[in-house]
Amino acid sequence: MNGTEGPNFYVPMSNKTGVVRSPFDYPQYYLAEPWQYSALAAYMFLLILLGLPINFMTLFVTIQHKKLRTPLNYILLNLVFANHFMVLCGFTVTMYTSMHGYFIFGPTGCYIEGFFATLGGEVALWSLVVLAVERYIVVCKPMANFRFGENHAIMGVAFTWIMALSCAAPPLFGWSRYIPEGMQCSCGVDYYTLKPEVNNESFVIYMFIVHFTIPLIVIFFCYGRLLCTVKEAAAQQQESLTTQKAEKEVTRMVVIMVVFFLICWVPYAYVAFYIFTHQGSNFGPVFMTVPAFFAKSSAIYNPVIYIVLNKQFRNCLITTLCCGKNPFGDEDGSSAATSKTEASSVSSSQVSPA
């Protein structure tokens, strides 16, 4: 084995020289230089500095402006709330531990941080699944003129949290475990060992199939069918130009969110899968640390995409920041500026573009 396994940790370094110590008790500066840990702490501080105000303002503006509280926006806000949750409960811990060079909060703190990080990431993934299914049903119309209403949105939100908990909670109850990963400053599911005492192998397989592969298959299927339908409708002029534009704009926003999610999380999933399928292979701590910390940036881009691509939300945000007045004269979002996201909550003939 090219790593050192303890009762509640796995350090990716052989202990032949006797320098390996528990990542809960000692700085891990034999894994990387102190400046590298400082760089991780600075990176997490930057994510917190950006993530807290962006996610908070997105939630606050939506609560303040009633017209933004549409059914589809419930799912988008659920995603933003999950990101805010990750920043508050996960990023702050990781920044502090990186400053010290080891996971200073002990095994219990590792379980808590790992749980919150996994929960937030899974809520984001399943929210994108719900958005993909909603786009497929509304645009492709496999269920005729289905209306995505408030009850459907609430059920969708509940579904995302149930699925996320079914992934994040088992390690808390003895199926697998959370351990420090990479440079030992943040915690995640144990991909490093088989650990038969906690049936770790079966959990990792379950996680990759149910909570990564299946969601991606659903997302790709929905958007594959959606793109075909949009092209057919445009060619046959089955929908009005305003309807087509509104549906395309909503779809574009969600597709961009999916693409960025994949950019952030696929490298982490690939590295984790490689480590799991190559037990005991030789890899450095940075090999897992870089994709793990890069994946954390996903908490920033979703609200940014939402703000940039949703004209009505931008108008409401400007109105809020300017104390109720929009200096650009589009204060309340005129009737011509109906939200793109409302396209999914009304019938096609009622949709107007943003």
Swiss-Prot record:
The modification N6-(retinylidene)lysine is found at K296. The keyword Magnesium does not apply. GO terms for biological process: absorption of visible light; cellular response to light stimulus; G protein-coupled opsin signaling pathway; G protein-coupled receptor signaling pathway; phototransduction; visual perception. This is Rhodopsin. The gene is rho. A motif ('Ionic lock' involved in activated form stabilization) lies at residues 134-136. Keywords: Cell projection, Chromophore, Disulfide bond, G-protein coupled receptor, Glycoprotein, Lipoprotein, Membrane, Palmitate, Phosphoprotein, Photoreceptor protein, Receptor, Retinal protein, Sensory transduction, Transducer, Transmembrane, Transmembrane helix, Vision. It is a multi-pass membrane protein.
